[in-house]
Structures are given as structure tokens and as C-alpha cells.
UniProtKB/Swiss-Prot annotation:
Primary localization class, coarse: nucleus
Gene designation: PCBP1
Source organism per UniProt: Homo sapiens (Human)
Task performed by this protein: Single-stranded nucleic acid binding protein that binds preferentially to oligo dC. Together with PCBP2, required for erythropoiesis, possibly by regulating mRNA splicing. (Microbial infection) In case of infection by poliovirus, plays a role in initiation of viral RNA replication in concert with the viral protein 3CD.
Protein name: Poly(rC)-binding protein 1
Residues with the Phosphoserine modification: 173, 189-190, 246, 264, 273
Location of N-acetylmethionine modifications: 1
GO biological process, any: positive regulation of transcription by RNA polymerase II
Amino acid sequence: MDAGVTESGLNVTLTIRLLMHGKEVGSIIGKKGESVKRIREESGARINISEGNCPERIITLTGPTNAIFKAFAMIIDKLEEDINSSMTNSTAASRPPVTLRLVVPATQCGSLIGKGGCKIKEIRESTGAQVQVAGDMLPNSTERAITIAGVPQSVTECVKQICLVMLETLSQSPQGRVMTIPYQPMPASSPVICAGGQDRCSDAAGYPHATHDLEGPPLDAYSIQGQHTISPLDLAKLNQVARQQSHFAMMHGGTGFAGIDSSSPEVKGYWASLDASTQTTHELTIPNNLIGCIIGRQGANINEIRQMSGAQIKIANPVEGSSGRQVTITGSAASISLAQYLINARLSSEKGMGCS
């Protein structure tokens, strides 16, 4: 890792989210919260942990990059201690690696993967860690999971490099501010129906709901601070709307946009409350070689974007000699903004995976 790049980012406030199983979180918290208190004090990072009635929980780390890296190193060391303890009386021939799951905005995954997978290959080779970026967004969010596995030093170094790529991506972003719909796990009692119709517990699904800080209120940002995210109040509104739906969350194609019926009065009322102005129209052009990524198989992707944003989206027929297709988005300013974000997230994701 380039030291100069690292030092230049030490004063940047960074927010990184981890997805962990309840048992792992319990170890990080420690008896009477002693372990997480020590990590907070020694690293200087702020640490939020989502409510405990879910099989999986979100740990949110916020602070200067050097504080984040210190907190990560301490968390990884704690996980390594747990592995060593579990191996004391074990007859297993090999010990499992330390494994972390980061939760990052889908718009940044393309940069992490790189053209033809070159960037993620570089990170793997330079750190020695195994790194896998999930192909699908986490349910009801615009985030994806990144799984990192290896020895503690490799995992720590890998996290640093991923953070640097995220910082670089933001600094080069022409838009500067993008909206992220954060993933939040659901309690185990709530079933979801996934792609293919399988029924399972929602340890990997969830509508947004409030998170609880062990020391204070929930954070307003779920990725790098400075990005525009849906506020906790709006998340609460979305949660209320989602719970009023009578159907289960049907995940079409596993993209994670489904779960809210945009035709319901509750959802229409929600978007109206965000922006009561008259409807407007926005047009954009998408290259012909990428339009299929937006439409999806049998229109699954575009329908999910319509449902999640509440906007009307029309894709013009191909025009001979044109290199792109015109897309017309109609709705309130809020719904148009969200539709644009979801389209950009899909494009960024597919470009990173080499969509042609």
C-alpha cells in the first residue's frame, strides 16, 4: 500500500460497515461491553452495533482512516483469538481463516473489481487474502457484501486497500454525492421468498429499520461521510410502508430492489411526502451495449427499479444508427433521483463485472 496515499487520507472521516453473525458480535462486545469499549478507546473510532434480535448484525465503524484501520486490526485480532480458542480441543487438521464481510455501496464495487477483474486480482496478490465481491445487492438495499478471508495481517492489509480504493473512487466521482440505501438484517422470525421460490429465514434479508448505538443515536451515514443517504426518518417511513405490505418480499433475480409495492397507496403517499411538487420528467441515454443490464431478463431489473423508486420509466425503441437508447423517467424529484441512482448502481455493477 502506498504510504503517501495513506497519509493523505488520514484526516478523512470514513464510515465502514461489517456484517457479522450474532456470536461474533458477542465476542466483539465482550462481557459487559468491555471489549468494544477498549476498541473504541484505543482506536479512537466510533462503533455502532445494530439491534440484537437478528441472526446477523451490522457493526459500523466511523472515524479518521487511521482510527478505522486500528479498530479493524483489533477486531481481526479478537476473531483470531476466538479461532485459537475453538481449536484448543479440536481434532481438525487445518484451522479456518479469519473471515470478514464488508458492506459497501454497489456503485463502488466496479472500481474494486476493476476492468476484467484486474483490481481485485491485484489486491488478492498484494495482500495474500481471499476476496470475493457478491454478484447481487443485499436485499432491499443498494449495497453488496465483500468477503475477505486469510491470516490477520493479510485481512487487515486487504481492508486498508479496499478503503483506499473507495476514497479514490469518491474523489474522482463527477457527481460527488450519491444516495445509498443501506442494508439492515431482519429478525429470524420473518420469512422471505427468494429467487426460485425457496422459503428461508431472513438472516440474509431485511427491510430497513433503525439501528442502536451502544452509546448514542444511530448514524446518519452508512458509507463514506459526505455521501447523500436516506435519513433515519425516511428509513423509518420506508420500514413502516414495507411492513404494511401483505405479501412477502419476492426477490426477482436476487438484485435486492424488491419488497415494496410501488402501486400501493402507502408507497405513493411516502414519495409524495418526500416531494409534494408536480411531476417532472428527466431523460438520459444509455449505451446499446448496456441497456440489457438495465432491462434484465424479461424486464425484471427495470421493473424492480420502477417499484423501488416509484417513478415511471420508459425505454425508447432502438433507433437505427444510434449508439444509445433514450430512457425517460417521470415522477417527483425524489423518485426521479432514486431511479437515477438505481440505474447508475446497476450500470456500475455490470461494468465492473464486464457486461458488454
